[in-house]
Amino acid sequence: ANDVEVSLLTLSGEGGSYTLTSSAVDVTSATAFSVTLNAADQLAAHGLLNKNGTASSGATTYNVAAAENWMTGSPASVTVADLTGNGITVSNVQTPTITSATYDSNTGILVVTGTGLFKKTGANNDIDISTLTLTGGTANATYTLTSSSDIEITSSTSFSVTLSGADKTAVDALLDQTGTTSSGGSTYNLAAADNWLGAADAATDISDASNSITVSTNPRITSATYDAASGALTVTGANLQANGGGADTDASKFTFTADGSSTY
């Protein structure tokens, strides 16, 4: 397959342009060829060609430009570059959705799973994280992320947000135990307001209100003090969580090591 050098084709649409990286293909006739885009090309193309028809949501007319030598068998003496006037008609644009999320309070990483995600031209602008609201804590308390740093998707089905500072503190308080419900009995939820995916058609409401969150974390012990007079052992750690029903810790799992490496 080498009739058409696909890497010399550039798509133009919403917010800019993108040069394909998919493999070369053969023509199917004297008047046509087709390309099945690789995964990276699809993510970019879907962001540019984000609305059915011949123009993007921002009214940019779709175009495919072919740089010189795109038709590999043409004579070197003939200029075959074809840069303008090559419209693209788009169909079957899918509405992006969120389906679920997981949160690790050790790392602060929120991994969101969805369908039909695609990239926006530029860097760190695929997902507007200020549109994401988490529910948990007591009486279904909510918190909307405040970080000004937007992020890129990792694939057509997922993206991840690393929380820090005030965002992590607030989210840890809401998602305060492992599983899908808080110690206060609230079901964890992730809601995304409209326009959460930057490249989506602005005229289409893509808000997504109900998506479960599953919390996982590894509690850590950092130090301990012991009062010999009272027999009180006070343990300090991180990510300690309420059980939600029954004892929070199992003291039989603790082992003490003393001088001489003796243990109890």
Regions found by a protein language model. Give the residues of each.
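Non-catalytic beta-sheet/beta-sandwich ligand-binding modules that flank or precede catalytic cores
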Residues: 1-264
